[in-house]
């Protein structure tokens, strides 16, 4: 598993972000594990890497403000989603990863469609 992490910000986004190994725990109660299918690069992502966006996550951080994925595993007490379901990821959750765990109640179920198109439903630059 991989994540696109940055430890600092700078004027050249490609110089501050790197693919690094991701260790992911099993989903906790109320969470699901998601395989990320598509996560676009928008102006808001670039401005976050350069430090020019209005809201900046604490460092180190994982890039990506929007995306879509497929549920791979359910934590205890999850009844609103099922394995194999496509979902819209929470805005700003660090979507430039191969997999992530997210709160099931923050995910939006999606119909089966092109993940690249669905991945761009939430963020405006």
Predicted region positions:
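Extreme N-terminal starter segment of soluble prokaryotic enzymes
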Residues: 1-2
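Short polar catalytic/cofactor-binding loops
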Residues: 7-12, 39-41
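Short gly/ser/thr-rich secondary-structure transition/capping motifs
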Residues: 13-21, 52-53
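Conserved hydrophobic/aromatic beta-strand scaffold that supports enzyme active sites
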Residues: 19, 24, 68-70, 99-101, ...
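Glycine-rich beta-strand-centered segment in the early N-terminal region that forms part
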Residues: 23-40, 52-94
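Cytochrome P450 core scaffold surrounding the K-helix E-X-X-R motif
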Residues: 44-50
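NAD(P)H dinucleotide-binding glycine-rich loop of Rossmann-like/cofactor-binding domains
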Residues: 86-125
